[in-house]
Every structure is written in C-alpha cells, then in structure tokens.
Amino acid sequence: MAAPEPAPRRAREREREREDESEDESDILEESPCGRWQKRREQVNQGNMPGLQSTFLAMDTEEGVEVVWNELHFGDRKAFAAHEEKIQTVFEQLVLVDHPNIVKLHKYWLDTSEACARVIFITEYVSSGSLKQFLKKTKKNHKAMNARAWKRWCTQILSALSFLHACSPPIIHGNLTSDTIFIQHNGLIKIGSVWHRIFSNALPDDLRSPIRAEREELRNLHFFPPEYGEVADGTAVDIFSFGMCALEMAVLEIQTNGDTRVTEEAIARARHSLSDPNMREFILCCLARDPARRPSAHSLLFHRVLFEVHSLKLLAAHCFIQHQYLMPENVVEEKTKAMDLHAVLAELPRPRRPPLQWRYSEVSFMELDKFLEDVRNGIYPLMNFAATRPLGLPRVLAPPPEEVQKAKTPTPEPFDSETRKVIQMQCNLERSEDKARWHLTLLLVLEDRLHRQLTYDLLPTDSAQDLASELVHYGFLHEDDRMKLAAFLESTFLKYRGTQA
C-alpha cells in the first residue's frame, strides 16, 4: 500500500495550480489597434449587460488600471457595412458622455477582419460589483439599510439621470435596474449600460438581432413601467425604474415567494413595509402608473426626503475643486506647512462664558484630503444650485439627420479630440537668448492623472486665445477647457511681460 502524500506537498501543488490558473487568466488575448488596451482571458460580469456577447477584463497600459473590454458581434457583414457610419456616429457621441456617476466609455473601434464583424469598446471597470450584489450581502449579514446611505445613493443616481435627461435631445437610459447600477467601496454610485438603449434604437431592424432587451429576463420585469414597449421611450421610463431601485435599496430585497418574476403583491408588501412616510411618498410618486404624473429627476432632488442645505464645507470643497487647475497638486500640504497650527480658525461667542475657540491644530488634514477626493469623485454632488441643463453639455446623441448625399472632397484626416478635462495647469515663461521671443512650458494634469507637458516658442504676435484654440484643434485640450486655459495663459503673459518691461 502506497504511503499517503505528505500534506505540505499537496498544499504546494494546489498553490501551484492556482498560480497557473491565475497566469492563464492574465494572458493577453488581443490588443487594441493603438496598443493601449490589452484584452485578458478573464471574463467579467458587469451587471448582465444585454446585447454583449462577451466582456473581458483588460489593462490600460498607459494608466496601469484595469478596464472592461466589451464586444458586440454582428453575423451579417453586409448589413453591418451598410450602417457602419451610423454605428460610428453613435459611439463617437457616447464617448462624450462624461459624469462622475456614469460608467465612462473610454474608446471604441470596429473590427471587420473576421467572418463576424465586431464593435469593441472599452469601459470603466467597477470592481466592487452591482447594487443588487451589495444588497444581497447586506441582507445576508442581517443588517438594515442605513437611511443616510439610501439618501446618498438616491442623490447620486438622480444626479446622473438629471444629467442624461437634460441633454438635447434627452438621453433615455431605458435599462436602469439594480444590475446596471454599481457601487464602489467608498460609496460612489456608477450607472452602467447607458449605451444600450441608444445603440439599439439607432440600429435598423436587420442589425438588431444581437441586442436583446433586458425585459426578456423575467426577474427584472418589475423595473419596467406599464407603458414600456407600447409608447415611445421618455424620461418617465427611467423615473419608474429609479423608483423600483429606490424601493429595493430601502427594503434590501423584494420577496418573490419562489417565483422567478416579482409580482405586484410583492411590490405592494415592500411599499407598505416602509416606516418613513416621506420615503414611501417619494417612491410612490416615482411608481405612478401614469407617466405624466411622475416627477423629473431634477425635481426629485428637491423632494423633502432628499433635500438638505449644503454645508459650508461642501460648498467650499466644490469651489476649491472647480479652480484646482490654478493650484499646485499638493496645495493642502504646502498651505499647512506655512500655517500656525495654534492660531484660532473660528470662534463661537457664548454669553457669560469664554468664547469657544477652534484652532487649526484640531483640523484633520488627512480627513480633509479624503473629503476633497470624495467630492472630486462625485460622492457628494452639489445639486441645490444645479442648472436644469448640465454644464458644458456636449452636443451628444442627437438623432442622425436624414441621409444626404454629399460630394466627397479630399480633406485632411481629423485629429482625435481630447475627452479628458484638465484639473491643474502650470505655466513657465523664459526669455530666449536673442530676446525676440519667449519659451513657454505648459504642464496640464488631466482628470485621469495623466501629465501632459508642452513647449512652445512664443512670438510677440501670438495670443492666449489662439494658442488655446490650437491645442483644442490638435487634440491636446478638451473643448470645455479652451476659455479656461486662454484666461490662465493671458494672466501669466501679463505677469511675466510686466516684470520684464
């Protein structure tokens, strides 16, 4: 009889097998045409996005972060080729959708080299999982939903919907469920699958086969309003879906009695179980059967269950972030070095008692840095002063005009436009040896932390506006940052030229 294999050896072999599996999953299967995105073998589930044939984990080699490699397959190559331009137009516009509570679509390209045509697009990877998964874990651990967390989540979802609905024409999500809403470890909410409804509506009938409606899944039927599929999609569709998500967040799970489909009775029981009358009224107005009676996403942000007067700290944080491009990256650290920590920051007078003083030493600068990062990431949107239209709204997702035959003339190849915003600007000017020009060094820090350093020999005839416009034209600067950079350069030119006069 053979002696049993020693336990340490078996453990080592199992560990080796796990390492081999891990290496297999990290194998690079494919690379984007530009070489930046590398598709891995490991498949990921980003909320059962309908219509996606495959979703893989990928690596952004420029930023060193994980992203998602999504693929849409089209078997009919002829039909695909006939509508290729329309598909490109839709994705060009989707890349422009930029909001902290919406999963970002970074890049797309078409692949027609194989028998099956593909649309490949890269999206942000949300590693913490879907809202549905989080709610299941919370319920399993026998924990109740915290009312403050519920309000914060609702505010972030409505912030994203308000942005989409304020576009011209409005962007209808049309597939909002707890499977397509994601939550990060820090409480940041991200809405995914924004592309699905727009893309499926833009496609002709002969290309819609790979786009499967989420409504085919019985377990998610209750997220869709009664009028769904019978009338043209409107913003009220998303409000109903949001109301069902808000209800599910409040009760953690809507019981199904073992059935696959969530029944009206189960939804009614969940509504009646809510102890907060304001929360119940808020959800009921979203779930109104008549779409005309459902409020807008923007007006829901002012409902008494969500509305609160923003603290001065939050207002200051938003103001700080909006103007951060004028400050060095480590501005908090630099300012605290020069600060007298024993100095009085604020004083509260008290009758017949000494005033209550608050000193700089009592401020946790580490907590302040974390708070600023949370505000920057979109966890605390500033909604009480929000305009009815999002600032810097791109001209996105307008229905394509009627096919007009245009005479094709040779035109230069357009440059890729920059989609990332600038969060910090630094500029330095040095006089050339011949004193005839200035040597400009410009550092732009983009929102994904990419540092872009540009140099330019400035002539006396060059203007700040022309320079900013040129950077936009050649794809070095986002269009929304044109005026901001022009003003920054103008003030820098005046300062340097004034000292040299």
From Swiss-Prot:
May regulate apoptosis of neural progenitor cells during their differentiation. The protein kinase domain is predicted to be catalytically inactive. Keywords: Cytoplasm, Neurogenesis, Phosphoprotein. Residues 7-19 have a biased composition (Basic and acidic residues). The gene is NRBP2. GO terms for cellular component: cytoplasm. Residues 38-306 form the Protein kinase domain. Residues 1-33 are annotated as: Disordered. One of its GO terms (molecular function) is protein serine/threonine kinase activity. The keyword Zinc-finger does not apply. The keyword Phosphoprotein applies. This is Nuclear receptor-binding protein 2. Residues 20-30 have a biased composition (Acidic residues).
